[in-house]
Amino acid sequence: MTLHFYTVGYEGTTVPDFLQAVQAAGVRQLVDIRALPLSRRPGFSKSALRSALEEVGIAYLHLRALGTPADGREAARKGRQRDLERIYRLQLELPEAIAATAQLRQLAGEAPTALLCFEREPAGCHRSLWLRWEAPEATVTDLFA
């Protein structure tokens, strides 16, 4: 099975622009891999985002186990990439993260799937780490809203 993932961050965008970007790419399901699916940006917290996506025919799923733990988020904010990678690698070894990874790979084989987190630039986000480590054979398209 050939896997293809889209990635998208909502940093600096609006819900309408975000929806336009994922719709234009043909995304059919969006998987939120934030540990905490909350946002100060209007419309990007879990319930509001799910509703907005479902209104345009895109399914929403939150996989908390693939999120970055608090100490990893702190390392990322402070630019400590090696610490972020070490912390996130340990997170992905947890049984619930292993199960979530299997679920995400299955979903991506069924329909065009986007990974969501906050950061606009994928290189600075754990979604790129997940893809590099857990789906290295996948093709990846980074979306920018």
Each language-model region and where it sits:
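Residues lining hydrophobic/aromatic ligand-binding pockets adjacent to catalytic sites
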Residues: M1-A145
